[in-house]
């Protein structure tokens, strides 16, 4: 059986801790590989080597660093299918969805080709008599990215691009559930010209995470995952003086107004709610139709669409709408929450319980579920399910609908479907959520805008990619310079204003 190790100093290396985790094929339920789990000693060695490599990389001309990003874009395009196939095999998502995973990461690397412009400083001449003042952006040094299972290409690339093009070295700790693609990305970075040691991929579990958080060398940590772990990482990183950017869970609401195109809204809900088996932090998991008539008509349109969804392995190609969830534990958790919805009184309109696929009975497949008449006190409303489950909460008015989204503890993404501009503008201005869609169900910003949630979906004041990506991985230094005229002067004892 294949054993996956780490990427250290420009090559794949075997783990030395003797500890491993199983890597499954979610479609079959079989263990297809084992991944090494790093010890603290392995991690510390990788960090020390990264710190040494960063010295020269940080001093490299920003345009030369940008050329590495440019070459990487070409290599990602060249190996798109290879990366997507490996991603689908370990994660379970369909092949087209896996290609989208790589593509959205690639787009951030494209944006990072413009790093020299983003890193330019500011200059003021004659700030005082014979005095010039300028500010510069400098890399932090060694930074870390701790990335999730659901986007094993996109999120590592979102972290790597701004960090590396800003002159940092990075310790990447990907999910141990689907570790192949991050290792492949590291190989492509080397082929693109990234010096050895500047990117270290260290596979591991909590021992590696805690080692990153406690390291005195690592200056910043970026994380994407669940809210409890995001809070843990944010608090522990901050306690050791690190800059932290931690993104957690979501419960994204889509409000459907009475004037909305309900066919369009139903199509949007099916794609946004069930794509990738619901394992997306930007998935729509709560539909909020306004008015009983709107709700009845929406359910009527949703049911046949959901019942037609095709669930199967990625090898079936275009014949499949979504694949399995990532682990047996994830499947069991979804089934538990679905049953809680039934027990607490929600109406299960489309019942995917007991779903089984011939030939793949041991796979981690979950049938599609649609709930109606869900109320805010139910677990399926409060909890991020991370599965193919859509909950419908009926609202009597627009104010009630927006109030539901505002009062929920998560604030990652949201959407409203309406033909009325005043309603859309009011919603966009009042909602306390980080990413908002107007007739767009999954409002993931493009690479040159920032991505980030509010409330318990995001911890830290700087977001991912866009301008915030460069701000997070750099710090400013301001220099005040004065060149003596040659006339000897006495010491100054007062803090004088510049005149």
Language model: regions and residue ranges:
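Conserved C-terminal structural/oligomerization subdomain of aldehyde/semialdehyde dehydrogenase
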Residues: 28-34, 218, 255, 310, ...
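Short, well-ordered beta-strand elements within core beta-sheets of diverse protein domains
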Residues: 32-38, 53-59, 145, 254-257, ...
């Amino acid at each position: 059986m294949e054993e996956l190790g780490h990427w250290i100093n420009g090559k794949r290396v075997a783990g030395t801790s003797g500890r491993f985790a199983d890597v499954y094929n979610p479609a079959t339920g079989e263990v297809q590989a084992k991944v090494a789990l790093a010890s603290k000693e392995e991690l510390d060695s990788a960090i020390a080597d990264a710190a040494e490599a960063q010295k020269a990389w940080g001093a490299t001309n920003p345009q030369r660093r940008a050329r590495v990003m440019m070459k990487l874009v070409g290599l990602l395009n060249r190996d798109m299918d290879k990366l997507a196939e490996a991603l689908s095999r370990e994660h379970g998502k369909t092949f087209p969805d896996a290609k989208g995973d790589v593509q959205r990461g690639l787009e951030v690397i494209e944006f990072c080709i413009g790093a020299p412009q983003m890193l330019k400083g500011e200059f003021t001449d004659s700030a005082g008599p014979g005095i010039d003042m300028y500010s510069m952006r400098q890399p932090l040094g060694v930074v870390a990215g701790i990335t999730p299972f659901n986007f094993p290409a996109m999120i590592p690339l979102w972290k790597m691009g701004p960090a590396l093009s800003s002159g940092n070295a990075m310790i990447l700790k990907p999910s141990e559930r689907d570790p192949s693609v991050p290792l492949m990305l590291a190989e492509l970075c080397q082929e693109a010209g990234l010096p050895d040691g500047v990117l270290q991929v260290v596979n591991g579990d909590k021992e590696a995470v805690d080692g990153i958080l406690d390291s005195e060398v690592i200056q910043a940590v970026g994380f994407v995952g669940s809210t409890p772990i995001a809070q843990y990482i944010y608090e522990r990183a901050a306690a050791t003086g690190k800059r932290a950017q931690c993104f957690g869970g979501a419960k994204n609401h889509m409000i459907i107004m009475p004037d909305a195109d309900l066919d369009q809204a139903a199509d949007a809900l099916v794609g946004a709610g069930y794509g990738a088996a619901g394992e997306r932090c930007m998935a729509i998991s709560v539909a909020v139709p306004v008015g009983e008539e709107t709700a009845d008509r929406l359910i009527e349109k949703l049911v046949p669409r959901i019942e037609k969804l095709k669930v199967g392995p990625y090898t079936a190609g275009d014949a499949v709408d979504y694949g399995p969830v990532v682990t047996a534990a994830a499947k069991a958790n979804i089934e538990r929450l679905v049953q809680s919805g039934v027990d607490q009184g929600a109406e299960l309109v489309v019942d995917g319980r007991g779903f089984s696929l011939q030939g793949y009975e041991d796979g981690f497949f979950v049938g599609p579920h649609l709930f109606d008449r869900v109320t805010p006190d139910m677990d399926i409303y409060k909890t991020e399910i991370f599965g193919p489950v859509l909950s419908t909460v009926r609202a009597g008015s627009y104010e009630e609908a927006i109030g539901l989204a505002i009062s929920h503890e998560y604030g990652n993404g949201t959407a409203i479907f309406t033909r009325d501009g005043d309603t859309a503008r009011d919603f966009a201005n009042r909602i306390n959520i980080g990413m908002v869609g107007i007739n767009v169900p999954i409002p993931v910003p493009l690479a040159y805008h920032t991505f980030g949630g509010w409330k318990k979906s995001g911890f830290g004041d700087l977001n991912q990619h866009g301008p915030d990506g460069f701000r997070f991985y750099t710090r400013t230094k301001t220099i005040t310079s004065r060149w003596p005229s040659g006339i000897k002067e006495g010491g100054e004892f007062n803090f004088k204003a510049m005149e």
